[in-house]
């Protein structure tokens, strides 16, 4: 069940990320270019049902809208209150559930390589859910925290200061 707890502090970073994605979405393409290696920015003006693709290892969040992802027999729903993490290449069917020209689907993500995943696993405490430790899924969602949202905001904000990307993007990405 999605966490529907409203956190007013999240609106500032969420709105800032949305503005930056919309400022770059000028050519009508859903996947926008970003000068930061591994950073993914996505805008869709209409719902799309059951698009087949392969998700690379990544952490992603939805700034506006919602999505359904089918991985084998499992269906994951996530929206503005959740984040998604994939630990390996996974074939999925994905559907953007909420999107319109007036309120487009906006997403942001960061590709991860196996070295980053291994390092994070060694240096971080084992992640948990409200019900205890996470299971061994290759893809899952979790409650979006303000620190994660703020880290994505700082990363996307670097696109407005390209002279700082080389020095700061790796630090924010690691965060």
Model-derived segments and spans:
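Acidic-enriched, low-complexity/disordered segments with a strong bias for Aspartate over Glutamate
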Residues: 3, 27-28, 45, 81, ...
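A short, N-terminal "cap"/entry segment at the start of jelly-roll beta-barrel domains
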Residues: 1-35, 39-42, 48-49, 132-136
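Amphipathic alpha-helical segments enriched in hydrophobic/aromatic residues interleaved with Lys/Arg
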Residues: 2-13, 17, 117-175
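N-terminal regulatory/effector-sensing and dimerization cores
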Residues: 31-128
